């Protein structure tokens, strides 16, 4: 079977169409650094109450912070402070 100019052009356009359609598909994962809108800044407020003691459980710090209308709460590494995290626009 001889390769004619018509078949070669059709083949090239087919390959070009396939490559361009694959390249233009949207990605499902979000790329870091390309967020839409302004970046949110984090505000951290720490309390030295005994919410992070092992007897009370580490979830008590998160519950304490959520009751104070913060987004979440984390204990420090030495379990001495409960730090509440809130995001500012």
UniProtKB/Swiss-Prot annotation:
Q: What is its main location?
A: secreted
Disulfide bonds, paired cysteine numbers: 46-84, 52-75, 61-82, 65-83
Print the keywords alphabetically: Antimicrobial, Disulfide bond, Fungicide, Plant defense, Secreted, Signal
Q: How far does the signal peptide extend, from start to end residue?
A: 1-24
Gene Ontology biological process terms, A to Z: defense response to fungus; killing of cells of another organism
Q: Which GO terms describe its cellular component?
A: extracellular region
Cellular location(s): Secreted
Q: Which family does it belong to?
A: Belongs to the DEFL family.
Q: State what protein this is by name.
A: Defensin-like protein 103
Q: Organism classification, top ranks?
A: Eukaryota, Viridiplantae, Streptophyta, Embryophyta, Tracheophyta
């Amino acid at each position: 079977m001889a390769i004619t100019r018509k078949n070669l052009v059709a083949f090239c356009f087919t390959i070009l169409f396939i490559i361009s359609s694959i390249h233009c598909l949207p990605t499902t994962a979000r790329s870091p650094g390309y967020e839409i809108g302004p970046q949110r800044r984090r505000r951290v407020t720490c309390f030295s109450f005994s919410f992070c003691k092992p007897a009370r459980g580490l979830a008590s710090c998160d519950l304490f912070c959520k009751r104070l209308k913060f987004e979440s709460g984390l204990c420090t590494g030495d379990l001495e402070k409960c730090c509440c995290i809130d995001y500012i626009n």
